[in-house]
Swiss-Prot record:
This is Diaminobutyrate--2-oxoglutarate transaminase. Disulfide bonds: none annotated. It comes from Streptomyces anulatus (Streptomyces chrysomallus). The keyword Oxidoreductase does not apply. The gene is ectB. The modification N6-(pyridoxal phosphate)lysine is found at K271. Its cofactor is pyridoxal 5'-phosphate. One of its GO terms (molecular function) is diaminobutyrate-2-oxoglutarate transaminase activity.
């Protein structure tokens, strides 16, 4: 496919230099459906990006679109703060019946604001309030958001530098396999906790991603996550799982921690929780932690009722019968087999992932960007991941068809060959 660079003048002259994704994908997109986007010139692109994980069910999913249109056409509440509404009630009841009860999860539900970093900030605030401590432990290559509290537990040096002030009360520890298996799990962490001279203040909580999406598709082993939960219990620290990108079915189960059999004290959800790409986030926590005073944490747009409508619809449509998890794992197997074949032909590459999130890394760290650039030329949207953008990240919609997935994987294989 030959793509003529579009007229981007208004974006280049008026919009801030902070824009990023559009620099790698120089097109003006006009419409989208399922796993495909179309630009204003009629070029079609297969989407292996899915709105950075916000579009697990594809673009303009017809089931969700119908529910949203019906709600708007009857003049349903749009802006509701934390007032009781029929849309919020329907979502809460559906979430409880379809997600929480079948998994025997007792969580209370908080609507902290519309974005993922709102959810993380509320989780950090609550953990500190409950424990009466300031420090929170995070992990190397973590990403938890771009506001100050979230940045303090984020690893990426470039993003941290944007804060412009010291980021305090966050301490990084080695993520799973950070030392390539040469150091026992949590050796350093436990030594610091037990040594009164280590200089580590007793943490209120530990925050972790089961798969580090922005950090390079680093996958924590189930046994590592179980050991982390046991460590938190022994040391009386709360365990926070940031499931903003890896939750809502991305790794197979609705929650990414289900495979490990752990029950975090606090869970953050956003991105695909609304199902339609509408802003929405949740902070879930065990009932005994619900010590908030009314209004102690709030936000103008925490009551985004159209998002509640699509969120309830997606749970009914995709999670009530248990088929979504099976389908995602089957699609993941399809990806894994293709990546095995690609890496067999490309000895400098390796891959890792779970469900429908995968990463491919090359010895030449610049190769990932070259692969993604060539993919765009061929009509496939891929992004990079990792602190040096050294990983090609595959994040297609969960609803992608086997044929579309195969098409995208064939394009990926071609890009790997052509950038060698």
């Amino acid at each position: 496919m030959t793509i003529t660079p579009p007229a981007l003048s208004v974006f280049e002259t008026l919009e801030s230099e902070v824009r990023s994704y559009c620099r790698g994908w120089p097109a003006v997109f006009d419409r989208a459906q399922g796993a495909r986007l179309t630009d204003e010139d009629g070029h079609s692109y297969l989407d292996f990006f899915a709105g950075a994980g916000s579009l697990n069910y594809g673009h303009n999913n017809p089931v969700l679109k119908r529910a949203l249109i019906d709600y708007i056409e009857r003049d349903g509440i749009t802006h509701g703060l934390d007032m009781a509404t029929t849309a919020k009630r329907a979502f809460l009841e559906t979430f409880q019946n379809v997600i929480l009860r079948p998994r025997d999860l007792p969580y209370k539900v908080m609507f902290p604001g519309p974005t993922g970093t709102n959810a993380v900030e509320s989780a950090l605030k609550l953990a500190r309030k409950v424990k009466g401590r300031e420090s929170v432990v995070s992990f190397t290559n973590a990403f938890h958001g771009m506001s100050l509290g979230s940045l303090a537990v984020t690893g990426n040096a470039f993003k941290r530098a944007g804060a412009g002030i010291p980021l305090v009360h966050g301490t990084p520890m080695p993520f799973d396999n950070y030392f390539d298996g040469t150091v026992p799990d949590f050796l350093w962490f436990e030594r610091l906790l037990e040594d009164q001279g280590s200089g580590l203040n007793k943490p209120a909580a530990v925050i972790v991603e089961t798969v580090q999406g922005e950090g390079g598709i680093n996958v924590a082993r189930a046994e590592w996550l179980r050991a982390l939960q046991e460590l938190c219990l022994r040391q009386v620290m709360l365990l926070i799982v940031d499931d903003i990108q890896m939750g809502c079915g991305r790794t197979g189960g609705f929650f990414s921690f289900e495979e490990a059999g752990i029950v975090p004290d606090i869970v953050t959800l956003s991105k695909s929780i609304s199902g339609y790409g509408l802003p929405m986030s949740l902070c879930l926590f065990k009932p005994e932690l619900d010590i908030w005073e009314p209004g102690e944490h709030n936000g103008t747009f925490r009551g985004n009722n159209p998002a509640f409508v699509t969120a309830a619809a997606v749970l009914d449509a995709y999670w009530a019968d248990g088929q979504m998890e099976k389908q995602t794992l089957a699609r993941g197997e399809q990806v894994e087999q293709t990546l095995l074949a690609i890496c067999a032909e490309e000895p400098t590459a390796q891959f890792r992932g779970r469900g429908l999130v995968w990463g491919m890394e090359f010895e030449d760290k610049a190769r990932a960007s070259a692969v993604c650039a060539r993919a765009f030329e061929l009509g496939l949207l891929l992004e990079t991941s990792g602190p040096q953008s050294e990983v090609v990240k595959l994040l297609p919609p969960l609803t992608i068809t086997p044929e579309e997935l195969d098409e995208g994987l064939r394009t990926l294989a071609r890009c790997v060959r052509e950038t060698a």
